[in-house]
Amino acid sequence: MEDLCQYLLVALPVVCFLVWLWRDSQRVPNITEKYVLITGCDSGFGNLLCKRLDRRGFRVLAACMTERGADDVRRAAGPNLRTALLDVTDSASIQKALEWATKEVGDTGLWGLVNNAGRSLPMGPTEWMKPSDFESTLRVNMTGVIAMTLAFLPLLKKGRGRVVNVASVLGRVAANGGGYCISKFAVESFSDCLRRDIHYFGVKVCIIEPGFFKTAVTNLESLERELHRLWNQLTPEVRDSYGEKYLLNYIKVQRFILNLVCDSDLSKVTSCMEHALTASHPRTRYSAGWDAKIGWIPLSYAPAWVVDCALNLVLPRPARSVS
């Protein structure tokens, strides 16, 4: 009896893992008949994803912020890809995109909505921000995701499809001030609530949590320019409490971190998105990038004091620090 128990203790995890692998490998049929709408296709993850899905035979509805971005997508696409201009912060633009998508998909419904559009800046010390600095990011990353999802849910319910929301590892660990981390935490919680509410209608919800990748979101020149703008808008009292050396060291730290961990292989993220759209049993969360898997995600389970200490070791100290 004791030998049997020991055998079961070893065999059960192995069997569970094999079952998980089998379920994870199952794919949905007839992808050439499925419509997927992707936001933020001008560059980065969205641009690569729409081209990859188009090559696989999906009917891609690529939503771009600019005409230039839409032209770039069309030049590299096949005959089944369609483009439209979309500003996720503008309700009229969302309504126009909904009417366009409704005509495109017809009675088929929408198989996938990939909420990829996003912005990261301004990002920096919290005290340097104004409310408008938070709002500009939250309108795209949080309110835009919510507005798009609610608008397209009827089409998704008709197609029994799935919502793929792009969050971030910074939706697990708040490492910077500004609206970015706040918005990505919001995407995580919104997606969890939506998944629990909407599964009754056959709609699945997946969260993509990329680590640091070389995209417009992690552009060093833009980050440094925004940090200088924030610094210049500070009152003399606040500026004096930090000291100009703090600004210079803060920029050095950001430059060092981004150069160290940013991955240029965007396909690590788009592969997760593709799995979420093609798997019969998509995962709830996908972590993309080595820094996410061995760094940020494990750190998110650590006590708050561990995270605080880790970040304090990296970030500079203000000139008039009292602790």
Give, region by region, the residue ranges found by the protein language model.
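The beta1-alpha1 cofactor-binding region of Rossmann-like NAD(H)/NADP(H)-dependent oxidoreductases
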Residues: L86-E99, P131
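SDR active-site lid
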Residues: Y200-R283
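Substrate-binding pocket helix/loop in short-chain dehydrogenase/reductase
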Residues: G124-T126, D133-E135
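Residue(s) in the substrate-gating loop at a strand-loop-helix junction
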Residues: S168
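Active-site helix of classical SDR
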Residues: T149, S183-A186
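Conserved glycine-rich cofactor-binding loop
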Residues: Y35, D42-S43
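Conserved NAD(P)H cofactor-binding loop of Rossmann-fold oxidoreductase domains
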Residues: N116-P122
